[in-house]
Amino acid sequence: MLEIMIVTHGKLSEGLKDAAEVIVGTSSHIETMCLESGEDIQTFGEKVKEKLTMINTAEPVLVFVDLISASPYNQALLAVNELTEEKKAATYVIGGVNLPMLLEAINHQMLHTPIEEAVEQIVKQGKDNLTVWHASAEEKNLDEDDF
């Protein structure tokens, strides 16, 4: 089964996991890592490496991070690069995590989707769920409905 690890600044990873569990129920295959304010980056990196090594079984692993090129992302990449070649090949780091992406990952986890296909769909879901709404758009639609 696809393993999921969420690595973020603050408690965001725990919040994302909690929100997902409200929607789809609990999962024993989602791990979280929180970079706390003032925490030593090297120490955090060691924790990420330990947890990633612990969960990285023969199954593929998705590591979600909140910001690319930030500390959680960099530490995740460093940890992945220390895995065996086989485990490294089965691990993907995805930046810019949001709740739709996590839900999509959980769906693919349950469906046992091949990792390459799952990653493609997860990233698409994350992008497709970005939108902007403003009241002026509603007013315009109301005006157009009059005709």
Residue ranges and their predicted role:
Residues 2-147:
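N-terminal loops that bind phosphate or other acidic moieties
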